[in-house]
Amino acid sequence: MTTAKLDAAPAAGREFDPVATARSLLRAARRASLATLDRAGGQPYVSLIGIASDEDGAPLLLVSNLARHAANIAGDARASVLAAEIGAGDPLAHPRVTLFGRCTAVDKSAKKARWLARQPDSAMYFDFADFHMLRLEPEGAHLVAGFGRIVDVAWNELRTETVDAAALFGAEPGIVAHMNEDHDDATRLYATRLLGAPDGDWRFEGVDPLGCELGLDGRSLYLPFPERVTSAADVRRMLVRLVGEAKAGDAAG
């Protein structure tokens, strides 16, 4: 259940969707703060990590066995991840979400393509034997999206259903490659016209049933789809539709 913590209303004319806001923050996050319990004394310990989202939106973490947080998690799997939108001005004016749960080990090789599409700079050490992959199994989330927008979000609301989307995820690497090789102009339109991002060589990083991820120079954005997709054909139709919407908006402007 989603529970509002403050009674103040959102800004007039803007509909606040806490689930969509939290989901976009997590899908777009490429770096985050990881909080664990120190193995030596039990104190809270916070470190900076790179992250990517799993198919259902849960965070994936690539961790070195030498890292202190790796030892902490080995002793107590409880952890939380803070993902924040970075921008100018007061950092507390920008939305952020904390996801908490327990870390479990996952097959690193099975997540390699997914990880490197979102964290390409880690390719040089991804296969090192002392690096392993963890997945935070979420139990809930806490979103701070501005004054009057402080909300608890249950994981069963936030997670992306994947049961009917095996075909989509099987095709995802090919979709990403095709978009970057043949349709970089479309990706640029999505970022600049639909998300209001600065112009640049935006790249397509990933897709799921509810949206797609776009990246430029270490920054990523999440573009929600107006309706759910579950196959490569669905994705193609959706991306063509969004190009039309982007061009129509450009012409109207």
Q: What annotation goes with each model-predicted range?
A:
Residues 1-253:
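Binding-site signature for planar aromatic cofactors or substrates
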